[in-house]
Amino acid sequence: MPQRQPQPAHPADGIYFGLMSGTSMDGVDGVAVRFEAGRAPVVLAEAFVGFAQSLRDALFALQQPGDNEIDRESLAANALVARYAVCCHELQRTAGLSRDEIRAIGVHGQTVRHRPERGYTRQLNNPALLAELTQVDVIADFRSRDVAAGGHGAPLAPAFHATVFGAPGETRVVCNLGGISNITILPGGDGDVRGFDCGPANALIDAWATRHLGKPYDDGGKFAARGTVQASLLDALLDEPYFTAPPPKSTGRDLFNPAWLDARLAAFPQVAPEDVQATLTALTAVSVAREIAQHAPGCKAVFVCGGGARNPVLLDALRHALREAGVPASVDTTAALGVPPQQVEALAFAWLAYRFTARQPGNLATVTGAAGNRVLGALYPR
C-alpha cells in the first residue's frame, strides 16, 4: 500500500515568495520562504534585482502629478513587473523549486501615491502580468483594504514584526530605515503593538548624494561623515508639522522629497553639501529617537532593518540621538535576531500572502487606525 503523504499543519502552509521594492526605488528584494503554522519561517533563498536608471527615472517622475500619467504609469508598471519576474525566477533557481511547489507570490508594488486622508493609496504594479510571466498565483494590493476600513494602509509590517521579533518581558523596537523611517513597538507583555512612520530616511539622504556625488546613495555614510551637523538647519527641518503629529500616521515621498528639502534649504545658502548630508542623517536619527522616547521610553533594544542598516554613520547617529533623548536602548540590526536586515520587508509580504491564503487578518488596527483587522490583498491566479 502506498504511504500517505504528511498533510500540512494548516491548509495555507507552504512556500511563498515575497517581493518588496521600497521608497528608495533602487531595485526589488525577494525571498523564498517556507511557512508552517506554529513554526518560525524558514528562508530558502533571497535575491536582489536592480532597476535600470531609465526605470528609476520613470518611477521618480510618477511621484509627482504630471501629464499623460495613465499611459506612463501603465508602461512603467509593465517594466517594473518584468524585473519582479526576473527576481522570482532567480529565487526559484536558487531554491531549486518547481512552479507547483510555490503557493503564491506576495508582491507589494511601487508606491507612487499614498493619500489615505483622501481614501486611496496607489502602488504601481501589474499582478496579472506577473502571474502570467511566472505561472504562479500572485497576491497583491495589500494596502487598499486597510484604507477602505478607514486606516492609513501603513505600516503593515508591524503584525509580522510581532510574530517574528517579539520577546516576552522585553520592550523592543523594530526600526525600518528605508526611504521612509518607521518603527514597530513590541511591548513584550500586555499592551498593543504600535507602529507608524517617523519621517524621511534614505529618500532624502540618497537624493542629496545623487545630486552632489552622482551616486545613488551615500555609501557607508562617508559623505555625511565628512560634514558637520548644522543645528539651525536641523531645527528648521524638524519644524515640519508631521514630526509632532500623533499616530496613527504614515507618510512618503508625497511629502518628503527634494522639493520639500530645497524649500527649507533656501534660507541656508551657506551650508556646504557635506554638512547638509550630515544634517539629513541627523534628521533621520533624531526624528526616530524622539518618537521612541515619547511612545516607548522603556525600550531596551532597537533592531534596525532596511537599507539604512548598512550605513554605520546613520546607526551611530541613532545611538547618539537615543542617548540625548534619554532612552537607554542598544542599537543593532535584525541580524542579531536571526533575520538579515535586507530580508525583513520582503519576508513581511511573503507572510502577508500566507495570511491572505489562510484568510487571516494582515493588518493591526491599533497601528493603522482602521475600523478593525482585515484580510489584506487580492488574488491573481496563474
From Swiss-Prot:
GO biological process terms held by the UniProt record: 1,6-anhydro-N-acetyl-beta-muramic acid catabolic process; amino sugar metabolic process; peptidoglycan turnover
CDD domains: ASKHA_NBD_ANMK (cd24050)
Xref: InterPro entries: Anhydro_N_Ac-Mur_kinase, ATPase_NBD
EC nos: 2.7.1.170
UniProt xrefs under Pfam families: AnmK
Record pathway: Amino-sugar metabolism; 1,6-anhydro-N-acetylmuramate degradation; Cell wall biogenesis; peptidoglycan recycling
Keywords: ATP-binding, Carbohydrate metabolism, Kinase, Nucleotide-binding, Transferase
SUPFAM superfamilies, per the entry: Actin-like ATPase domain
The keyword GTP-binding is assigned to this record: no
Top enzyme category: transferase
A single MF term (Gene Ontology): ATP binding
Reaction catalysed by this enzyme: 1,6-anhydro-N-acetyl-beta-muramate + ATP + H2O = N-acetyl-D-muramate 6-phosphate + ADP + H(+)
Top-level taxon of the source organism: Bacteria
Binding locations of ATP: 22-29
Family indicated by similarity: Belongs to the anhydro-N-acetylmuramic acid kinase family.
Function: Catalyzes the specific phosphorylation of 1,6-anhydro-N-acetylmuramic acid (anhMurNAc) with the simultaneous cleavage of the 1,6-anhydro ring, generating MurNAc-6-P. Is required for the utilization of anhMurNAc either imported from the medium or derived from its own cell wall murein, and thus plays a role in cell wall recycling.
Name of this protein: Anhydro-N-acetylmuramic acid kinase
